[in-house]
Amino acid sequence: MLPLFKSHFSIGKSILTLDDPKKVTEGGSDSVFKIAKDNGLKQVILVEDTLIGFFEAYKRSKEMGIQLIFGLRLSMRNSALPEDEGSQHKIIIFAKDDLGCKLLNKIYSKAFCTNTGFLDYNDLKDLWSEDSLKLAIPFYDSFIYINNLSFGNAVPDISFTKPTLFFEENDLALDFILKEKVKEFSINNGIPMTKVRSIYYNKKSDVKAFMAYKIICNRTFGRDRSLDKPELPHFCSDKFSFEAWKEENVTI
């Protein structure tokens, strides 16, 4: 099971930082790279919603001699037309080499400078390199998820590449149903599945700190949220921690 780390550079999604392990203090924020060092990880798989933290992650991995596998989680739509807003879903694009990193920058710029934070598949195909990029379909918020569980109408064109389907088991009520849909898509289309775990905090006991952070980041005028009434959909698991991943894995 692959651990997919996310940092605070993906605002509202993680309480982990990319700080130098030597600068992490007791009682302070946990660092992805401190976790990696303490647990002897030879690689860090980092999946972010932005490229803002990429250089810091790259620099830190070089300093520590750890392999960095960086993925950009990006919104996709059927087209840029307003009526296709309901087709929005997520994909993950991993860079395989230096050219892949440059292409990620072009893809990110296209999504956020030309469009309002999304691409369609024609845009993606124009910028794609099979040798330098790898496409993965995330478990949550993918086209499989929105089409089956959110009344979405995503029509993805992934014929230009050989993707991998991610699936997770985090004790959420929807996990079993969604996993079956992913498995069905995998069999029907001959696409491999890989088990992963999204990691947003270090210890299971950090779940309340993570919840408080999400409440702050998701504040809405007129809505009173608290730890007793967080109003965070599908937020009922402490599995999104490194500790939970470690309990199920001896080595990486």
Give the label of every model feature segment.
Residues 1-252:
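Phosphodiester-processing cores and adjacent nucleic acid-binding clamps
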